[in-house]
């Protein structure tokens, strides 16, 4: 069975993604979904799948790393089967937190979405005020998904050190980078058994073509190289100003 699938978006990538998240929530019988809580530096636990329509994984701002907040959040529902919606950097951090024994990652259904980049908080607020609605910034970032999202030089400082903006390592990984998102998104699962459990053959729009998968991976490779050069340039600059 394929572990790479597509979702046809019909011009609405956010609505399509949220509906897919709601579907897998209901199919896996989650008790809740942990998401970032808007501008607040805290996690938020959704307990009704109908609330999924209010979240926006493409929102280009990040006030805290959700993985660092999860251990405390999970104490609220110690016996619950929960999902968590993460950016790639948060997924990597979650693995580290789990390896330190701060939480049991196997009690979570992890969902990771390609990151289109984030602005510094003050710039995000300024741009939102100019556009009159912060949702416009998410839509703008999505427009540039085929090219890699917002430009690296506009990222907040932490994002400039990012290893990769590609969704990887979660049980459900959603691809948007390098793709014509008004037409299609990709779904990647590392476990064929989960694909069968979710019945992806019916809730998706079929297996992803090798060309589409390669298209995303090619852009991710270029983005990772760009990020590496950016990190090296920043570190070289620091080396020049720090005392020897």
Specify the residue positions occupied by each region the protein language model found:
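Iron-sulfur-associated redox domains of electron-transfer enzymes in respiratory
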Residues: 1-243
């Amino acid at each position: 069975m394929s572990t790479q699938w597509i979702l046809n978006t019909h011009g609405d990538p956010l609505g399509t993604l949220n509906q897919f998240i709601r579907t897998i929530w209901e199919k896996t019988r989650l008790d809740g979904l942990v998401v970032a809580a808007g501008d607040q530096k805290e996690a938020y636990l959704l307990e009704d799948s109908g609330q999924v329509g209010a979240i926006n994984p493409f929102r280009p701002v990040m006030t805290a790393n959700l993985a660092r907040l999860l251990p405390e959040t999970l104490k609220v529902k110690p016996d619950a089967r929960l999902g968590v919606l993460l950016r790639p950097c948060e997924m990597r951090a979650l693995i580290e937190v789990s390896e330190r024994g701060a939480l049991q990652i196997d009690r979570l259904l992890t969902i990771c979405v390609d990151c289109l980049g984030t602005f510094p908080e003050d710039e995000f607020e300024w741009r939102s005020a100019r556009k009159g609605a912060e949702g416009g910034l998410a839509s703008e970032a999505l427009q540039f998904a085929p090219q890699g999202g917002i430009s690296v030089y506009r990222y907040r400082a932490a994002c400039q050190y990012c290893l990769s903006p590609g969704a990887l390592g979660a049980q459900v990984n959603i691809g948007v980078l390098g793709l014509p998102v008004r037409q299609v998104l990709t779904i990647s699962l590392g476990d064929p058994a989960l694909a069968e459990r979710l019945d992806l053959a019916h809730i998706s729009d079929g297996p992803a073509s090798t060309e589409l998968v390669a298209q995303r991976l090619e852009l991710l490779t270029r983005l990772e190289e760009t990020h590496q050069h950016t990190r090296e340039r920043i570190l070289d600059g620091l080396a020049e100003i720090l005392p020897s």
